[in-house]
Amino acid sequence: MNKQTLPTAGRRRRPCVQIVRGLPGSGKSTLARRFDCLHLELDQRVTSGRIYRWSPKADKVAHQWLKNELYRKMVDDRIDLVVAGVMPRHDGTMGEIFANAFDAGYEVFVKTLGEHPFRESVHDVRPCDMARFRKLMMTDDEVREAVLADETAYSAKFRRWFTAHVHFDFVMPFESEVRNG
């Protein structure tokens, strides 16, 4: 498999966290595995050798595990990371990743995958849950605007860091498969 290195930003390279987000079945895991760094995602916590079936209860436990593991790796190990998950909004897991990256001095690259036009979810997510995910999913511009506008949750210093060190890229799933396949 052809591994990609994380992009560098600026003269002095900061450690990076790559967030790969998108709807279930969009190819997040496939793309995340292509980066040459530690790969963490919710599926790793939930599966433990079984076929992964999404459920709100399992998802809650997995999100907490992911946040704890990412924070530990950022603070203790200071290594490049890639994390894959749905992460529809700025104020959930993605917001905590931003806050931890700010505290640890990380550069953040967010890749948002579009919905795969030819594939059903590989995780047997119910259609009503997929509809809810679609409704919740913020665009990259909406995430950026929400973070920069929220003066109560985010300090001015954080918002300056966010503007300089968080980078967004929208990728159609089949494009990533062709480019990286």
Residues of each region from the PLM?
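Conserved SAM/SAH-binding loop
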Residues: 24
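Conserved substrate/cofactor phosphate-moiety recognition/catalytic segment
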Residues: 30-77, 118-120
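Conserved GTP-binding G-domain of TRAFAC-class P-loop NTPases and closely related GTPase folds
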Residues: 2-7, 17, 21, 34, ...
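Conserved glycine(s) of the Walker
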Residues: 27
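Phosphate-binding P-loop
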Residues: 8-14, 74
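Conserved Rossmann-like nucleotide-binding pocket used by diverse enzymes
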Residues: 19, 40, 82-83
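Glycine-rich phosphate-binding loop used to anchor ATP phosphates in small-molecule kinases
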Residues: 57-113
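Pre-Walker A (Motif I) flank of P-loop NTPase domains
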Residues: 13-18, 78-79
